[in-house]
């Protein structure tokens, strides 16, 4: 067989033309130390802070400490399979989570992976978990109310859309109940809710999700959970994952409520990571940047200007106190970042005042301008009346000789406390709240026995719905009080039909 020189040269030319000279360059390092969810790697000189890194077994890590000779990596998954000498490579990406309407009604972990057994989430959109907060010119004043459905909050410490309101109190004082009831009340309010459960028992989260489902609130809610048994990195990341999911809706002109339950556990997880990364400890062994941990999260809550779509993201962070000490490190940090706080007191809770809100220590710095006019008018003096009642109550224990005006204040105060009590998972629409608080502040309840107040409220609501529904509709649609003489007549008419239990 003769060799054809022409064929050979054609073949060589083809090979040269088809030669692919692409060279893949990847930054690869070596694990030099691993343990307790932290790895140190040598050779990743160009790694960026917060960059995702991939270990040889497919587990991802987050570059946290960029040191002279090595990189401190937080491992986002099981670390027992990673050993010294393993390869770790850069991805060039920062951590992102899936976002979009496909997540509504689902329970996910902080990486955005579904854990509710309902199959994969079909979304192609992602957002970085760390993002800059909206600037001054991108925001506008908080002017729309966020109705929680809880009388004590909507009347005394109103919350506006785009506000950050801290809910603070000891364990077992009803903090999570406030969150759940607020989400239940958003069902028909065109509001998307994100509930971030940080370091809670799986059984508690399951019960909460079941409550949302039972009351029809799950379809507009995303639940992000990092359980008590999850590694510290997931607890640390979960609030950022939740706010990133919320920002997707906010920047599309929608209204979002994000609840962080609770940030004390996130701070403890971050302290654990920081100490393992050998960062110098400060007060209460927290690292120096623990303030920034929470400020960069909560600053992402905003009411956007009309030019940016007019969306809003409202943040309700929770902080757990030890024996009512609100002057501890994390509580004072978060109080200084937020626009007000609602303080839940354990002795009020155990004496049957639920929600156990202490009106003296609770404040809303911007919510007042978002409160509807009708509520502002009827609840204007309520906080002061309640504070003076608490003071008088303490003094009245020492003597029985009280003048008439003091006795009248005590009587009104007892009825105020009774009106502000509310059952579990029973949020109330704002027009019905206005009706009962109007009855209280205008003296209609002064001669009703204290033990009958709650029955009076229930029956008044039913009577108004059946006989004078136009008054409730007027409050709901205009936000203003109806004509006072009409309102007085309606309540008077009902009062004549009401039978106190001592009759």
Curated annotation (Swiss-Prot):
This is ATP synthase subunit alpha. ATP binds at residues 169-176. Its EC number is 7.1.2.2. One of its GO terms (cellular component) is proton-transporting ATP synthase complex. It is an enzyme of class 7 (translocase). F-type ATPases have 2 components, CF(1) - the catalytic core - and CF(0) - the membrane proton channel. CF(1) has five subunits: alpha(3), beta(3), gamma(1), delta(1), epsilon(1). CF(0) has three main subunits: a(1), b(2) and c(9-12). The alpha and beta chains form an alternating ring which encloses part of the gamma chain. CF(1) is attached to CF(0) by a central stalk formed by the gamma and epsilon chains, while a peripheral stalk is formed by the delta and b chains. The lineage of its organism: Bacteria, Bacillati, Bacillota, Bacilli, Bacillales. The gene is atpA. Gene3D superfamilies: 2.40.30.20, ATP synthase alpha/beta chain, C-terminal domain, P-loop containing nucleotide triphosphate hydrolases. It holds the Pfam family ATP-synt_ab. Keywords: ATP synthesis, ATP-binding, Cell membrane, CF(1), Hydrogen ion transport, Ion transport, Membrane, Nucleotide-binding, Translocase, Transport. CDD domains: ATP-synt_F1_alpha_C (cd18113), ATP-synt_F1_alpha_N (cd18116), F1-ATPase_alpha_CD (cd01132).
């Amino acid at each position: 067989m003769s060799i054809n020189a022409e064929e050979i040269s054609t073949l060589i030319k083809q090979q040269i033309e088809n030669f692919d000279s692409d060279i893949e360059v990847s930054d690869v390092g070596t694990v030099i130390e691993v343990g307790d969810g932290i790895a140190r790697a040598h050779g990743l000189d160009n790694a960026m802070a917060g960059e995702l890194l991939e270990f040889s077994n497919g587990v991802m890590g987050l570059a946290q400490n960029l040191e002279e000779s090595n990189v401190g990596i937080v491992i986002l998954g099981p670390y027992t399979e990673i050993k010294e000498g393993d390869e770790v490579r850069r991805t060039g990406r920062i951590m992102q989570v899936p976002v979009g309407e496909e997540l509504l009604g689902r329970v996910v972990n902080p990486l955005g992976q579904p854990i509710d057994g309902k199959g994969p989430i079909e979304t192609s959109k992602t957002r970085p978990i760390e993002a800059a907060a909206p600037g001054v010119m991108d925001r506008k004043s908080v002017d729309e109310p966020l109705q929680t459905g809880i009388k004590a909050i909507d009347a005394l410490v109103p919350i506006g859309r785009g506000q950050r309101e801290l809910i603070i109190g000891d364990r077992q004082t009803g903090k999570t109940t406030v969150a759940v009831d607020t989400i239940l009340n958003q069902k028909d309010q065109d509001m998307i809710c994100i509930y971030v459960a940080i370091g809670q028992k799986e059984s508690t989260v399951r019960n909460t999700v079941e409550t949302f489902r039972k009351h029809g609130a799950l379809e507009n809610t995303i639940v992000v959970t990092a359980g008590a048994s999850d590694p510290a990195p997931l607890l640390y990341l979960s609030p950022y994952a939740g706010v990133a999911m919320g920002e997707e809706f906010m920047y599309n002109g929608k209204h979002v409520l994000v609840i962080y339950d609770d940030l004390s556990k996130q701070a403890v997880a971050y302290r654990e990571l920081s100490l393992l990364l050998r960062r110098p400890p400060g007060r209460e062994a927290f690292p120096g940047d623990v303030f920034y941990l929470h400020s960069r999260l909560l600053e992402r809550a905003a009411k956007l200007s009309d030019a940016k779509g007019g969306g809003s993201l409202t943040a309700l962070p929770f902080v757990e106190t030890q024996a009512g000490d609100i002057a501890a490190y994390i509580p004072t940090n978060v109080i200084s970042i937020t626009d007000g706080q609602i303080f839940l007191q354990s002795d009020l809770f155990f004496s049957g005042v639920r929600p156990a809100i202490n009106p003296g220590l609770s404040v809303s710095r911007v919510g007042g301008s978002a409160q509807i006019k009708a509520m502002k008018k009827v609840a204007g003096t309520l906080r002061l009346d309640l504070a003076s009642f608490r003071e008088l109550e303490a003094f009245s224990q020492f003597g029985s000789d009280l003048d008439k005006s003091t006795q009248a204040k005590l009587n009104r105060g007892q009825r105020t406390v009774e009106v502000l009590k509310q059952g579990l998972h029973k949020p109330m629409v704002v027009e019905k709240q206005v009706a009962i608080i109007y009855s209280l502040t205008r003296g209609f309840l002064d001669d009703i026995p204290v033990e009958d107040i709650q029955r009076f409220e229930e029956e008044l609501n039913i009577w108004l719905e059946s006989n004078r529904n136009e008054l409730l509709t007027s409050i709901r649609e205009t936000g203003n009080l109806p004509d006072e003489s009409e309102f007085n007549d309606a309540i008077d008419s009902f009062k004549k039909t009401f039978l106190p239990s001592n009759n």
